[in-house]
Amino acid sequence: MQVFEGKLNGKGLKIGIIVSRFNEFITQKLLAGALDCLTRHEVENTNIDVIWVPGAFEIPLVAKRAVHKDYDAIICLGAVIRGATPHFDYVAAEVAKGIAAVGLEANKPVIFGVLTTDTIEQAIERAGTKAGNKGWEAALAAIEMANLFKKV
């Protein structure tokens, strides 16, 4: 029996990070968590590109272009927070579907690190307080998946 798993060492990996500027007070913390994780796992700073987009809805479109670059993985970071209108439901669903579709179509790890929360407080908790930092977790998944793709 063979077992395949990705190692958590980022040495030599090239990572693209797409970050939504909307709700930047949250996404800035997600980005900081992702960068910290990548650095601690030996991804060289020169092998990390950060791409800012206006909002979460634009992430899949830019990810679709970025997968054709030499990245081993792409991390998508954003924060969609529920408001008083159904806008949240449309944006959250389309961003999730879009990011998944890009990864499947490109056969490359495209990691979903977009918060979809009911409140600002929940977003803050997931950006580095009570519930950890989902940017860090997305970066760790990117490292693991990039290494796994080299084996499978």
Curated annotation (Swiss-Prot):
GO cellular component, one term: riboflavin synthase complex
Residues binding 5-amino-6-(D-ribitylamino)uracil: F22, A56, F57, E58, A79, V80, I81, F112
UniProt: (2S)-2-hydroxy-3-oxobutyl phosphate binding residues: A84, T85, R126
Active site: H87 (proton donor)
Signal peptide bounds: none
PANTHER family referenced in this protein's UniProt entry, alphabetically: 6,7-DIMETHYL-8-RIBITYLLUMAZINE SYNTHASE, 6,7-DIMETHYL-8-RIBITYLLUMAZINE SYNTHASE DMRL SYNTHASE LUMAZINE SYNTHASE
Official protein name in the record: 6,7-dimethyl-8-ribityllumazine synthase
Gene: ribH
